[in-house]
């Protein structure tokens, strides 16, 4: 007879692309006639803003703008500032990308350089890094045996996995009227405004992804004495993102934030100075759902002739997700009396396999502006790295997301500049497994066992083995062997004398 099966559908999002692309943008700046000649450049700032991301057949097009500025010293040692916007377009290519591919994008600056072409012209070189994951809806039909005859023995196994089931986006604005703290030097001209939005709390409430976070502002500016100053401010925000599905408490949400624009205007008041702040942020939410996959990995019949049909398929299983925090405390030789400003740019990470795991390396570049013992403004760039280690089996894969914490800074020491930052690594480990499932078959019960077939077998086990294997070999059941021998475990130890009912 033909065995009956039911179709069970399992739906999720399948990641079809995991891409990364770095690209250098260049721009020449002409120093206006009203400004003095440049003697040397000190530091270049660049902050990325996303404008659009468009999925196409075979590619993902990401466009944006870099808010860039260059601080230079004139021949008298005074500080001068040039500002500009540098547009960028990156095309990430993959044959697996389609027009309907849903994307989650990260954008960062790898490095920002400035150099003099001549005393009236400056060249900016900015390297921008875009990382993207592409997802598409995927439905799998899993066959399960129904109304199985009592003589048909099944060995089923359940696998738990956390899979993405939905992505959604919400663009929102954060605005606030901020007070410059009392005692701070007045802001005359902004050199840079680095905005780092961070999610501090997120969860799912029905069909909404609710998030709370902080928009962290790091300002660099020139004061009334034309000296370089920094100021850190924070603006809390609370938002939600509408989802298509309605979720319970066992799902999680992962949110990736991108800055789409920043406006900051200093305003003088009778009591001091205020900052009119506004920013655009894009929240990219991914819902992660725990799912259980149950498969019949082996089967046999105690009677008749059983002809099974098997199907093998590869699955990607998420084994672990963890967050690690690592300090960044390197020091570099520099005759600095005070550090005026510091920018740290992370590069693309690299994974190093070890005997018992993997090390995630992130190269870092630190651009510093400081005053020397004579009070002159100097600048230096240093390179270092931060890493973290986690246990990982040889046949598993690891993915990481890196982020610098916003409260970092650099300090001058004895003949050195020390970085004092913290890094956060979000690690996930995966394993690809080829799993077998019973998808069809026939069972002919008219074929009877041989007449000389024994009713009981007595044997001693040579090695520890599962009762399932013994039962399958002698076409009996594991339960019958357990009952006859008063066993409680699914395996039997080596050297055990067994009574095997047939």
Predicted regions and their residues:
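Primarily a LysM-type cell-wall glycan-binding module
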Residues: 444-483, 488-502
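Membrane-lipid interaction segments
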Residues: 2-445, 450-453
């Amino acid at each position: 007879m033909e065995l009956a099966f039911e179709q069970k559908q399992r739906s999720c999002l399948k990641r079809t692309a995991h891409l990364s692309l770095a690209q250098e943008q260049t721009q020449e700046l002409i120093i206006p006639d009203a400004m003095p000649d440049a003697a040397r450049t000190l530091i270049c700032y660049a902050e990325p803003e996303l404008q659009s991301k468009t999925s196409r057949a075979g590619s993902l097009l990401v466009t944006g703008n870099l808010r860039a500025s260059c601080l230079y010293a004139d021949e008298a040692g005074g500080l001068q500032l040039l500002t500009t916007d540098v547009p960028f377009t990156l095309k990430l290519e993959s044959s697996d990308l389609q027009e309907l591919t849903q994307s989650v994008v990260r954008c960062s600056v790898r490095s920002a350089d400035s150099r003099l072409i001549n005393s009236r012209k400056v060249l900016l070189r900015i390297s921008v890094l875009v990382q993207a994951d592409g997802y598409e809806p995927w439905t799998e039909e899993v066959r399960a045996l129904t109304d199985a005859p009592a003589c048909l023995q099944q060995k089923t196994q359940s696998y738990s996995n956390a899979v993405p089931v939905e992505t959604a986006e919400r663009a929102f604005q954060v605005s606030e009227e901020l007070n410059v703290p009392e005692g701070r030097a007045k802001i005359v001209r902004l050199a840079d405004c680095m905005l780092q939005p961070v999610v501090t709390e997120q969860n799912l409430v029905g069909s909404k992804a609710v998030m709370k976070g902080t928009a962290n502002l790091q300002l660099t500016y020139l004061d009334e004495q034309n000296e370089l100053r920094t100021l850190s401010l924070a603006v809390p925000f609370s938002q939600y993102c509408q989802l298509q599905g309605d979720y319970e408490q066992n799902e999680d949400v992962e949110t990736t934030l991108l800055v789409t624009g920043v406006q900051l205007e200093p305003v003088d008041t009778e009591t001091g100075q205020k900052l009119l702040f506004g920013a655009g942020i894009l929240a990219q939410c991914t819902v992660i759902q725990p799912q259980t996959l149950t498969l019949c990995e082996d089967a046999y019949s105690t009677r008749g002739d059983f002809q099974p049909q098997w199907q093998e398929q590869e699955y990607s299983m998420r084994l672990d997700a963890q967050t690690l925090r690592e300090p960044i405390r390197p020091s570099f030789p520099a005759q600095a009396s005070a550090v005026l400003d510091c920018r740290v740019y992370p590069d693309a990470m690299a994974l190093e396999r070890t005997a018992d795991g993997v090390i995630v390396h992130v190269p870092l570049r630190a651009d510093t502006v400081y005053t020397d013992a004579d009070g002159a403004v100097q600048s230096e760039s240093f390179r270092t790295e931060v890493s973290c280690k986690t246990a990982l089996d040889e046949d598993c894969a690891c993915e990481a997301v890196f982020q610098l914490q916003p409260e970092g800074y650099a300090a001058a020491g004895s003949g050195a500049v020390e970085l004092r930052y913290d890094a956060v690594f979000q690690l996930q480990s995966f394993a690809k497994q080829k799993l077998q499932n019973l998808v069809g078959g026939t069972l002919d019960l008219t074929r009877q066992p041989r007449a000389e077939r024994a009713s009981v077998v007595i044997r001693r086990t040579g090695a520890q083995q599962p009762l399932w294997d013994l039962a399958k070999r002698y076409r009996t059941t594991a339960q019958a062997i357990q009952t006859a021998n008063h066993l409680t475990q699914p395996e039997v130890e080596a050297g055990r004398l067994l009574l095997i009912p047939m």
